[in-house]
């Protein structure tokens, strides 16, 4: 009897140990949330583990800048939804940046890039900070020369694209990694798409109703699954703008001081706000729109004084904070 019990206990312990040793199922490289379309990858840059790994390594490597002082992650920190906490991020040599670093969350869905929309693909956008004097202040061919002397990069480049490090693998691998930065599991998403009615508080629900109402017109610019129309708007931040915005690209006078509408996903962790980081907090942003902004001939006519009460402003802020995706901002896969 004792022998049988001992055998049974031994088998039970063996089964328990084997159960504990079962490897965890790795998280997929690309997870598309409910309510989101699948992002498109170019035919010459489809997602593979090798390309993801190479792009991620380059994203965090200061080898990308002339003096090896800054990387992509220096201005796009993962815990801040891949944005920065300062108005304008310092570049190589400590030179001040010209514009606020936007979040990279859901960058895969953007139809064009930079604040004025002058870059048509994510692969091409990778070149912008490299060449910009106030950012990396470098040349992509010189970066490639650096990478060719690194045996790890040479091996990873061959595994990812079947070629040695060059401009092609730099732009494509980083773009491939960035397309996986998809955020869509905020408490708002849990409420809206996952059927969790208790995911939002009463204040957040009131703020949501206000956000989508004609009283605020927030959703006229911040709509869709990514809370942006990607249109170019003047929001009355100044009467005279130091930055010409989209006019810099088109030289059309009606585009003066118009900038691409940003996503509001994770907006609570991406302060400061606006194209130049002028507004330090979400409360300041709400107050700006509540006041109707400054007078400018190209200001969107929907931006006008709202007359929000203190409670309505608090509810609106609460809703905006519910758009934070904590899992995304803490995901070790992206770090």
What are these regions (language model features)?
Residues 5-12:
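Sec-dependent N-terminal signal peptides
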Residues 109, 136-141:
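Short sequence/structural segments immediately N-terminal
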Residues 14-16:
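C-terminal motif of bacterial Sec signal peptides marking the signal peptidase cleavage site
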Residues 21-128, 189-297, 329-335:
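Short glycine/threonine-rich turn/loop motifs
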Residues 135, 180, 187-189, 199-200:
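Short His/Asp/Glu-rich catalytic/ion-coordination signatures at enzyme active sites or charged loops
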Residues 54, 140-159, 163-184, 278-335:
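C-terminal capping alpha-helices of c-type cytochrome domains
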């Amino acid at each position: 009897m004792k022998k049988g019990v001992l055998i049974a206990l031994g088998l039970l312990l063996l089964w328990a140990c084997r159960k504990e040793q079962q490897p965890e199922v790795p998280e997929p490289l690309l997870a598309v949330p409910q309510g989101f379309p699948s992002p498109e990858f170019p035919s010459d840059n489809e997602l593979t583990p090798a390309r993801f790994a190479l792009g991620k390594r380059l994203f965090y490597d200061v080898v990308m800048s002339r003096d090896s002082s800054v990387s992509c992650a220096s201005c796009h920190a993962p815990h801040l939804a891949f944005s920065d906490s300062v108005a304008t991020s310092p570049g190589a040599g400590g030179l001040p940046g010209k514009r606020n670093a936007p979040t990279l969350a859901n960058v895969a869905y953007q139809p064009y890039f930079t604040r004025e929309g002058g870059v048509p693909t994510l692969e091409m956008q990778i070149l912008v900070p490299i060449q910009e004097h106030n950012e990396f202040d470098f040349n992509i061919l010189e970066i490639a020369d650096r990478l060719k002397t690194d045996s790890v990069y040479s091996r990873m480049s061959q595994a990812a694209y079947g070629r040695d490090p060059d401009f092609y693998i730099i732009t494509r691998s980083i773009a491939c990694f960035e397309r996986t930065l998809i955020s869509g599991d905020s408490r708002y998403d849990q409420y809206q798409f996952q059927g969790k009615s208790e995911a939002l508080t009463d204040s957040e629900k009131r703020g949501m109703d206000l956000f989508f109402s004609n009283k605020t017109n927030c959703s006229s610019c911040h709509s869709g699954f990514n809370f942006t129309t990607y249109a170019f708007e003047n929001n009355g931040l100044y009467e005279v703008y130091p930055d010409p915005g989209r006019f810099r690209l088109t030289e059309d006078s009606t585009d003066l001081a118009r900038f691409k509408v940003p996503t509001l996903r994770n907006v609570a962790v991406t302060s400061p706000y606006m194209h130049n980081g002028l507004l330090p907090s979400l409360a300041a942003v709400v107050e700006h729109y509540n006041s109707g902004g400054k007078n400018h001939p190209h200001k969107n006519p929907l931006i006008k004084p709202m007359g929000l009460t203190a409670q309505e402003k608090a509810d609106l802020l609460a809703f905006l904070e519910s758009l934070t995706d904590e899992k995304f901002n803490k995901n070790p896969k992206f770090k």
